[in-house]
Amino acid sequence: EITYEYNDEKEKDKVISQSIKVGDIINKGDTLKVVISLGKLDKEKLASDNINELGTVPIMMYHGIVDMKSSETEYTGGNVDKDGYNRTAEAFREDLEFYYQNGYRMVRLTDYIDGNIDVEYGKSPIVLTFDDGNENNLKVKGLDEDGNIIIDENSAVGILESFKEKYPDYNVTATFFVNGGLFNQPEYNEKILKWLVENGYDVGNHTENHLDIKKSTSEQVNKEIVSVYKQLDEIIPEKYVNIIALPFGSPYNKEHENFGYVLKSTYNGATYETKAALRVGWDAEYSPFDKDFDPTFLKRCRAYDNNGKDFDIEMVFKLLETKRYISDGNVSTIVTSEKNSSKISDNVNKEVITY
């Protein structure tokens, strides 16, 4: 078990202390705990580098990734439909390159929600999500001689995996929200789900039939949510995430009578609790350390092109330039300016450093 902390006496990356020393008798079950130095705390550098772990975090919302060049579509930029919900493979590759070159590093949605943001110094977290379980999210071309799935290199996961190879320091991950058809490849669905959770990706709930929760009965809401959780329980028990991406972003406020069934769903004797719910748009979300952070109703940023208007991908990242979360590289501390300190949640159990 390794933790890091600032230390005025030990140089960066040197061992400050360890629980088991030379000559110690090691018993079964003993854990080696090591504390590594981050070097001397330099508040002037933190300030000059704009380190701010109270900044906002973009949760990107994707749907289909279509094997096309952007020049082949009649719509704006990399959009494949007029509303920009589906994106060309070329545009998705460009998105990933843009994130990397502009200092964004992917983190798991669950880690963001839990405040476990492990991002290198000076970089910013970004979360990727995909709705609907489209076949082109992870398209299977067949099986190899060992029975493993062969992933289409132009599907979303194929493209993501290529970035793992291109940038070894790029923590490639995403959360896929599925309906009752899972990834719409019946002969491969089970293998797809298992492959995803074994390779750094997560799978969540998008209701059985893409239900408009605002327009539905309480029984429908419970049935649709429980149905997907039960499917995931049967195939990847304890390995999926209890998170729902709300179809259509509905209901549009937490006061709606059906919202309680989103967070706790019961049908035919089965009950599931949901830790977080995702909306459809539009802007970056609060830091998980901000007192206004609410994981049960998280905003997302639509990954579409609209010439820098209406919170398209260009506009979102332009706005983030002055308010983005910038990491100090230490998951055990929260660093921000003194003027931001009043925004820190009372529930935070990490060391707070201000400059």
Where are these regions (language model features)?
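Acidic (Asp/Glu)-rich catalytic clusters
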Residues: 160-171, 185-205, 269-271, 287-297, ...
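Alpha-helical scaffold elements lining the catalytic groove of polysaccharide deacetylases
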Residues: 141, 148-159, 183-202, 208-236, ...
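C-terminal active-site subregion of NodB/CE4 polysaccharide deacetylases
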Residues: 46-128, 139, 215-355
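Ligand-recognition elements built from short beta-strands and adjacent flexible loops
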Residues: 1-42
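Alpha-helix termini
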Residues: 148-151, 161-171, 235-237, 262-272
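Solvent-exposed coil/turn segments that connect beta secondary-structure elements
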Residues: 5-7, 37-39, 65, 131-133, ...
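Envelope-exposed proteins and targeting segments
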Residues: 11, 16, 28-32, 56-58, ...
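Short loop/turn segments at strand-loop or loop-helix junctions that form parts
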Residues: 60-65, 129-133, 179, 206-208
